[in-house]
Swiss-Prot record:
This is Head-to-tail adapter protein gp4. The keyword Hydrolase applies. GO terms for cellular component: virus tail. One of its GO terms (biological process) is symbiont entry into host cell via disruption of host cell wall peptidoglycan. Monomer; homododecamer upon binding to the portal ring. Interacts (via C-terminus) with the portal protein; this interaction participates in the head completion. Interacts with the Tail hub protein gp10. Interacts with the tail needle protein gp26. Gene3D superfamilies: P22 tail accessory factor (Gp4). The gene is 4. It comes from Salmonella phage P22. InterPro entries: Gp4_sf (IPR038258), Tail_accessory_Gp4 (IPR020362).
Amino acid sequence: MQIKTKGDLVRAALRKLGVASDATLTDVEPQSMQDAVDDLEAMMAEWYQDGKGIITGYVFSDDENPPAEGDDHGLRSSAVSAVFHNLACRIAPDYALEATAKIIATAKYGKELLYKQTAISRAKRAPYPSRMPTGSGNSFANLNEWHYFPGEQNADSTTPHDEGNG
């Protein structure tokens, strides 16, 4: 099953809950589908937090057009499972169901993995601070009279080191 649209994410979540699937030939009412798509949009907005939260690549609907089930979701393939498992946990009470322990565990693990991926992508390579000595074993640095690591470099290499000391 290819999960390309927001409606596909909702159907996958409902399939995990056992509410609707192609195997049982049960379908979801259009209003229930729209409610679930709205829940998906709200959940992804909570996760995203204006760029400070989890980055999944989700494409939000614009203010003029409400989210529709045919809209592309834009998620990275590594985020799809975590999203529809968490959506299943979120919409289960709407159908008077309780998500199984496996769905809850998979949702939790998937969201933690997305947090880790986002944190790793945001982390920058931190150089040694300029107060850190190079050490006596670093013979090349000692030959050049470099006794400390250079630390962060100036963004503009033409800026003199003594700028502003005058």
